[in-house]
Amino acid sequence: YLVSPAGYAALGAYMFLLILVGFPVNFLTLYVTLEHKKLRTPLNYILLNLAVADLFMVLGGFTTTMYTSMHGYFVLGRLGCNLEGFFVTLGGEIALWSLVVLAIERWIGVFKSIRNFRFTEDHAIMGLGFSWVMAATCAVPPLVGWLRYIPEGMQCSCGVDYYTRAEGFNNESFVIYMFIVHFLIPLIVIFFCYGRLLCAVKEAAAAQQESETTQRAEKEVSRMVVIMVIGYLVCWLPYASVAWWIFCNQGSEFGPIFMTLPAFFAKSPAIYNPLIYICMNKQFPHCMI
């Protein structure tokens, strides 16, 4: 065993918590949206996509990790490793690109009156398709020989192999591709869209300083922007930073805990994504009651 039995018990307990909270919250999101017609709007499609992505991670990854943590190593073999790595990566990437699409949609929403643009169901479906295609460009290559999925950290879950330079897998090029396309670009887009959104709301508030409604809207949008950006950074910054450090320092000493902790952060959105992106929509709580 790479760590003490208490470490594996803690890992299993954390996975159980993610399943216990993540499954009902995301399932409830899907159920409530499908049951209430007023929630089935094009702008809410991407929130449904986010819930589906979280369920992928819960059912395809967290349950597996909880089971393998009871044994102290990944007991499901090469096929099991590929499947677990694929579902967790796919779910995580769908969620990531859903946040990008959501940021773009909200940015467009601010300027649609200026540009005479109407956000339709076709645009929403295009956003969903884009998030799935981008997720597939990250999750599929390790199955076909560009990089690979291997047990990582405490060896109870599988992820992309960013810490070895195995011959024949072109790990270096894939890690660089992942860091640029699946971390930096989404980060830039999210910062740009929410930054522009915040500026637009502040300009509107400045033009109507005496309007209490406008000032309240400014505060709500500002809070939403801060929470969304922090949520993205908490999820992906630790994982991307550690992966890049390990990649750039091949041969350095690092323990299993060092590689496992960032994965904890990357999996936590299955709980807080619904709370941030759905509960902040005032229609959802009313429909749940």
Curated annotation (Swiss-Prot):
GO terms for cellular component: membrane; photoreceptor disc membrane; plasma membrane. InterPro entries: GPCR_opsins, GPCR_Rhodpsn, GPCR_Rhodpsn_7TM, Opsin, Retinal_BS, Rhodopsin. Its main location: membrane. Gene3D superfamilies: Rhodopsin 7-helix transmembrane proteins. Keywords: Cell projection, Chromophore, Disulfide bond, G-protein coupled receptor, Glycoprotein, Lipoprotein, Membrane, Palmitate, Phosphoprotein, Photoreceptor protein, Receptor, Retinal protein, Sensory transduction, Transducer, Transmembrane, Transmembrane helix, Vision. One of its GO terms (molecular function) is G protein-coupled photoreceptor activity. It comes from the Eukaryota. The modification N6-(retinylidene)lysine is found at residue 267. Glycans are attached at residue 171. Residues 1-7, 68-81, 145-173, 246-257 are extracellular. The record marks 84 as: Plays an important role in the conformation switch to the active conformation. Disulfide bonds join 81-158. Phosphorylated on some or all of the serine and threonine residues present in the C-terminal region. A motif ('Ionic lock' involved in activated form stabilization) lies at residues 105-107. GO terms for biological process: absorption of visible light; G protein-coupled opsin signaling pathway; visual perception. The chain crosses the membrane at residues 8-32, 45-67, 82-104, 124-144, 174-195, 224-245, 258-279. Residues 33-44, 105-123, 196-223, 280-289 are cytoplasmic. The keyword Flavoprotein does not apply. Belongs to the G-protein coupled receptor 1 family. Opsin subfamily. Photoreceptor required for image-forming vision at low light intensity. While most salt water fish species use retinal as chromophore, most freshwater fish use 3-dehydroretinal, or a mixture of retinal and 3-dehydroretinal. Light-induced isomerization of 11-cis to all-trans retinal triggers a conformational change that activates signaling via G-proteins. Subsequent receptor phosphorylation mediates displacement of the bound G-protein alpha subunit by arrestin and terminates signaling. This is Rhodopsin. The gene is rho.
